[in-house]
């Protein structure tokens, strides 16, 4: 009550922010007459002036009013477009490192030019991040004339660019690119072997377009660069043949109930589980097919990889549907469909062997499983930027998540003109067939009066179902889904014409405005060298059509189903009513829709259906509230999943930072001999401690063991026993020093033979290669640990704390192994000449380039990344067939030493 009263009196936080920014808008507007009087040359010279003032100590915030006024004036001269006051406010919000919620059609692309120009003055580069290549190229080419007029360079960062072109693009003042490509470049740079192979500069300022799509919808998708693991394609095919023999069971087994089905499906968490009967049946089938020995079980350690294949095949058949979750393209490849945008994602593959299982199910060529070489989530990549900001039409529903995870405040920017779109209440039908019949009738009525219609569907399958129904009704229409995405811009340009009907999956076409009356620019672009007279004629024709569409009611939006997220529904609605245009929207639902079926209570469903007749619809506030409640529930669960993923990934992220900082250090210096020397002393001290325990009696010393170890592991002839016999004054500390001095002398002798420079290059090469190999193995070990950590909860332990503790132990082990491996390799290697070092470097570089070419974002399903929800990890590059030997257990070789002090040092 008091809070509401205070808000009325002093305004909300958003209102107060806008009041403060409007004062600066006045300041910018005051510069307008002065800047209008400047010649083009004087206006261009402002960039040089601003850079000089920055060098003299002025801040970007102090320059902001003049810089924004400069961009506005340049835009008027280059495009004939003047930034609205609300766009200036949006630009200031972005410059402050916040999220600007701007409605569709309010000119986000032009708004981004303001903070991009201002921050580019610092000379550190500005990254403008888009969701796909088309938007990156379009926005870069659209804004290039403006930035070049002001003396700024513009670059584009898209996949498959030649290395020199990519490196040059990163030197541009303002760089447009996709989120995937920026993330992959970061990972590739941290696999590079020489400084000149890297492309990225420091990460200074990023403006993320469609920020909700990138930082929330894709937050659960790690970017992974992977290399091929062992080939097991035949096994996928053989296990795939068994899955159709399994029967679904509706209810989980319990103490009171044991069903006769083989698996159960949990639709809420999108998981599938074998029942006890199912496990026994699968084991019988495995034995019959020669995949398992008689009497063996799926859950024995040696069969873990078989269990992994069965789970993957079962999920592929039961949970993943063709034309909904993926399509099979003309080349016979399984291509993932993004559940949020409805776009295909070529090059991305599901992990955990799921992609191979789907390939086996569809009978196409099975590609090898992959092993992770480098990985990062978008959450952690974008947090590397000194300043991060974003734009979207719908961020307010996720404002809490932006604030808690990224520290980004959301500011809702007012529209330039009042919004007059009519959002009608939802209507609910009993069945999907009745719902589609009502949609067809609505479309017919609107087409007859010349009103354009955009129909949003949740999957390719539903869009094709509706398309077939429209064909039967003889209604002309366009389909915009993952199968036709290359025609996207063309279809969107036509979607605002009188009577046009467009079916789009989710947010396909997002980022491109639907202009009422169609796009006159598209018509001009299709003409060869049009005259000004022809352009004016096209504009006049368009104006007549535009007014006709406005009279018919503007663009009408039909939602065929509610999405799990209110934000996606709002995005669909937001396609209509741009720039104060007329428009309307309505969602048609049925009790068979996924959201209502899964999340509406049985009582509510029975209540609704009891009084309904065929073809009858109901509109009810209670039902709308119930649907919104279900959506909030799903959003809350998805937020918890993302938050939990981040908490686990933060552990790996801290380790990633240490490894990448070490790599940076190694690559930035030519001579690491001091580091090698320090490591040699550390490693040898540790080895000597094992055989001559500190402050121990001579009777406890194992001198023969020490001599043998020094010879085998470090190629050092140190007759320790003989030294002691010859010099009875040689005590423990002096003996240690003598062993280390001998090792140093042996290494120096090697240096004299091959030359200091050759050895320096070789040291660096060995250190980098060993670090990369160990890091790759460490990522696999971390995955392995992550997959089973939730089971610790059953032992009354906190899985997160256990994960932190054990991953820290693994990481300590990595650093120790790195030291010992490098010292052992350098001690035993015989470098002949410079050519060998160069050959090794070339080989290592070729491997890194090949891995980089194979870069792929593996789509990890949200559920498989939940620690305490599932026993499947978020990808499974390596499955161990034998039990792992503990570091402190006796070594299997029979030496009597601990594993970590014997063969564990080699492995």
From Swiss-Prot:
The keyword Ribonucleoprotein does not apply. Signal peptide: none annotated. Zn(2+) binds at residues 891, 893, 902-903. It is a peripheral membrane protein. GO terms for molecular function: ATP binding; metal ion binding; protein-exporting ATPase activity. Gene3D superfamilies: Helical scaffold and wing domains of SecA, P-loop containing nucleotide triphosphate hydrolases, SecA, preprotein cross-linking domain. PROSITE patterns: SECA, SECA_MOTOR_DEAD. Residues 841-853, 872-887 have a biased composition (Basic and acidic residues). ATP binds at residues 87, 105-109, 513. Residues 841-907 are annotated as: Disordered. Residues 854-865 have a biased composition (Low complexity). Part of the Sec protein translocase complex. Interacts with the SecYEG preprotein conducting channel. Has a central role in coupling the hydrolysis of ATP to the transfer of proteins into and across the cell membrane, serving both as a receptor for the preprotein-SecB complex and as an ATP-driven molecular motor driving the stepwise translocation of polypeptide chains across the membrane. Belongs to the SecA family. PANTHER family: CHLOROPLAST PROTEIN-TRANSPORTING ATPASE, SECA INNER MEMBRANE COMPONENT OF SEC PROTEIN SECRETION SYSTEM. NCBIfam families: PRK12904.1 (NF009538), secA (TIGR00963). Monomer and homodimer. Part of the essential Sec protein translocation apparatus which comprises SecA, SecYEG and auxiliary proteins SecDF-YajC and YidC. This is Protein translocase subunit SecA. It comes from Vibrio vulnificus (strain YJ016). The gene is secA.
């Amino acid at each position: 009550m008091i809070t509401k009263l205070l808000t009325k009196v002093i305004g909300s936080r958003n209102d107060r922010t806008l009041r403060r920014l409007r004062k600066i808008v006045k300041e910018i507007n005051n510069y307008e007459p002065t800047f209008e009087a400047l010649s083009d040359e004087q206006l261009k010279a402002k960039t040089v002036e601003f850079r000089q003032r920055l060098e003299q100590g002025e801040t970007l915030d102090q320059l902001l009013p003049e810089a924004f006024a400069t961009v506005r004036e340049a835009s008027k001269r280059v495009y004939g477009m003047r930034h609205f006051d609300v766009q200036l406010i949006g630009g200031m919000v972005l410059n402050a490192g916040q999220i600007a919620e701007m409605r569709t059609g309010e000119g986000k692309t032009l708004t981004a030019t303001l903070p991009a120009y201002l921050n580019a003055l610092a000379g550190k580069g500005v990254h403008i991040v888009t969701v796909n290549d088309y938007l990156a190229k379009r926005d870069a080419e659209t804004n290039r004339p403006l930035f070049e007029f002001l003396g700024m360079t513009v670059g584009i960062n898209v996949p498959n660019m030649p290395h020199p072109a990519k490196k040059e693009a990163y030197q541009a003042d303002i760089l447009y690119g996709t989120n995937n490509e920026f993330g992959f470049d970061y990972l590739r740079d941290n696999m590079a072997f020489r400084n000149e192979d890297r492309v990225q500069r420091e990460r200074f300022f990023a403006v993320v377009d469609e920020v909700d799509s990138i930082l929330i919808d894709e937050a659960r998708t790690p970017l992974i660069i992977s290399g091929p693991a062992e080939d097991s394609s035949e096994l996928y095919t053989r296990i795939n043949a068994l899955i159709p023999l399994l029967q679904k069971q509706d209810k989980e087994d319990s103490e009171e109930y044991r069903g006769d089905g083989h698996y159960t499906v949990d639709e809420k968490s999108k998981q599938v589980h074998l029942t006890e009967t199912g496990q026994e049946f699968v084991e019988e089938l495995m034995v019959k097919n020669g995949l398992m020995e008689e009497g063996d079980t799926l859950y024995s350690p040696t069969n873990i990889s078989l269990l992994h294949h069965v789970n993957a095949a079962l999920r592929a058949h039961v949970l993943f549907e063709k034309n909904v979750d993926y399509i099979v393209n003309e080349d016979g490849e399984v291509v993932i469909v993004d559940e949020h945008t409805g776009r295909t994602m070529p090059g991305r593959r599901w992990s955990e062997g799921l992609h191979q299982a789907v390939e086996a199910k569809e009978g196409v060529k099975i590609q090898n499983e992959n092993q992770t070489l480098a990985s990062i989530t978008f959450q952690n990549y974008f947090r590397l930027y000194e300043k991060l900001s974003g734009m979207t039409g719908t961020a307010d529903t996720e404002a809490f998540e932006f604030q808690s995870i990224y520290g980004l405040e959301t500011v809702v920017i007012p529209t330039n003109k009042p919004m007059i779109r009519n959002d009608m209440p939802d209507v609910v039908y009993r069945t999907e067939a009745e719902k589609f019949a009502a949609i067809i009738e609505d479309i017919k009525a609107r087409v007859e009066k010349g009103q354009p219609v955009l129909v949003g569907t949740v999957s390719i399958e539903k869009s094709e179902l509706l398309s077939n129904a429209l064909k039967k009704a003889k209604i002309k229409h366009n389909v915009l889904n993952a199968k036709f995405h290359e025609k996207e811009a063309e279809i969107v340009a036509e979607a605002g014409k009188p009577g046009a009907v467009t079916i789009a999956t989710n947010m396909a076409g997002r980022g491109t405005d639907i202009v009422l009356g169609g796009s006159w620019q598209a018509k001009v672009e299709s003409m060869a060298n049009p005259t000004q007279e022809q352009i004016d004629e096209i504009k006049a024709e368009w104006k007549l059509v535009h007014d006709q569409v406005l009279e018919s009611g503007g663009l009408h939006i039909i939602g065929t189903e509610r999405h799990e997220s209110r934000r996606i529904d709002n995005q669909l609605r937001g396609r209509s009513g741009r720039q104060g245009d007329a428009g309307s929207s309505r969602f048609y639902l049925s009790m068979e829709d996924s959201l209502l079926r899964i999340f509406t209570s049985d009582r509510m469903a029975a209540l609704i259906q009891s009084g309904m007749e065929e073809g009858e619809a109901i509109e009810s506030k209670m039902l709308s509230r119930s649907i919104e409640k279900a959506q909030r529930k799903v959003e809350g669960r998805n937020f918890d999943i993302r938050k939990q993923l981040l908490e686990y990934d933060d552990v790996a992220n801290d380790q990633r930072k240490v490894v990448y900082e070490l790599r940076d250090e190694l690559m930035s210096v030519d001579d690491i001999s001091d580091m090698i020397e320090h490591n040699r002393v550390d490693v040898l001290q540790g080895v000597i401690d094992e055989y001559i325990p500190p402050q121990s009696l001579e009777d406890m010393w194992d001198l023969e063991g020490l001599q043998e170890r020094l010879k085998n592991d470090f190629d050092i002839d140190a007759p320790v026993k003989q030294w002691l016999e010859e010099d009875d004054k040689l005590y423990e500390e002096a003996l240690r020093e003598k062993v280390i001095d001998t090792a140093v002398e042996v290494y120096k002798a090697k240096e004299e033979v091959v030359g200091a420079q050759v050895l320096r290059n070789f040291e660096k090469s060995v250190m980098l290669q060993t670090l990369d190999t160990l890091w790759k193995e460490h990522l696999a070990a971390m995955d392995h640990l992550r997959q089973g950590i939730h089971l610790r909860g059953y032992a009354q332990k906190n899985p997160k704390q256990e994960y932190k503790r054990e991953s820290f132990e693994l990481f300590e082990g990595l650093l120790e192994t790195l030291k010992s491996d490098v010292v052992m390799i350098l001690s035993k290697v015989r470098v002949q000449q410079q050519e060998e070092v160069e050959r090794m470097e070339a080989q290592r570089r070729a491997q890194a380039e090949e891995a980089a070419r194979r870069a792929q974002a593996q789509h990890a399903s949200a559920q498989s990344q939940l620690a305490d929800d599932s026993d499947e990890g978020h990808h499974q590059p390596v499955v161990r067939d034998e039990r792992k030997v503990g570091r402190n257990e006796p070594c299997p070789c029979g030496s009597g030493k601990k594993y970590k002090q014997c063969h564990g040092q080699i492995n």
